[in-house]
Amino acid sequence: MAKKTRKVDSKEVGLEIGFSLFRYFLNTEYLHYGYFCEGLAAEPQNLAPAQTRYAEFLKSNIPAGVQKILDVGCGTGRFAFELTNAGYEVDCVSPGAILTNHARKLLGERCHIYNCKFEDVATDKKYDLILFSESFQYIDTNRAFTKALKLLNPGGHIMICDFFKTDPDNKCKLGGGHDFQHYVEAVKKYPVTLIHEQDISKETAGTIDLANKFTMEVLLPTYKLVFLLLEDRFPWMTKFIKWKYQKKLEKIERKNLSGERTGVNFMRYKKYMFYLYKVVE
């Protein structure tokens, strides 16, 4: 039997939910992690300024002479918007439908958006810098570098800011990220020179603490109250749901509602890295 094709991407739905929550409660349209450097505590009211600092960190590392940028996985388009305000010519890659609509509303005619996967971008245009801001983890490393090299001008740059797995046994409750050692070895095959490398795990870990606090203080109580109400109103249906989806519910509780998705565990099992490469001419 053919495998049923899912028309709705769960990752994109998750990002859309996050965007709605961030915009309504925290007054931010960024979807990336916050950069909690010294003097900025990991508190809900500080997420928006921490995300702005993250964006400023990326901009501050754009090499002189760069004019044309391809933002891979542009999210809501907010960072691309800021880059155009700074005078850069920016195009975007956005594979999903939901976030692409947000980006198009914000960017208008400022940027061309390739509504496809990065590997499927078809264009004769060349860029000075290709940016992967928390999008690299969704693309195979070899495919990402192979495609990037085809789209870059001679002497162009690749900027990656994302987290990687450092736990070979995969004990971490936090998903996502390429295996760090595999990534380091894979990049050696390509004609690029490492210009700047920086570990920002400590600065970004506060984002995980905020997410965990929201989970434990809002989502978990809500989850329990919903089942409490269902058991009172629809006892037989609730028993059936718990029996039918026992393994899935246990997985959700174990992975997402255990309270183990903390900044400390993030730094223990993950490594959030910034890389800037220059293509060898």
Annotate each PLM feature.
Residues 1-38:
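N-terminal, positively charged/glycine-rich alpha-helical extensions of SAM-dependent methyltransferases
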Residues 48-65:
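Conserved alpha-helix/loop element of class I SAM-dependent methyltransferases that forms part
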Residues 70-120:
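Class I SAM-dependent methyltransferase SAM/SAH-binding core
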Residues 120-130:
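A short acidic, Gly/Pro-enriched loop at the edge of an enzyme's catalytic core
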Residues 129-141:
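A short SAM/SAH-binding and catalytic strip from SAM-dependent methyltransferases
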Residues 143-157:
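A short glycine-rich, Lys/Arg-flanked "PGG" loop and its adjoining helix->strand segment in the class I
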Residues 171-262:
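Substrate-binding/catalytic lobe of Class I Rossmann-like enzymes that use SAM or dcSAM, i.e.
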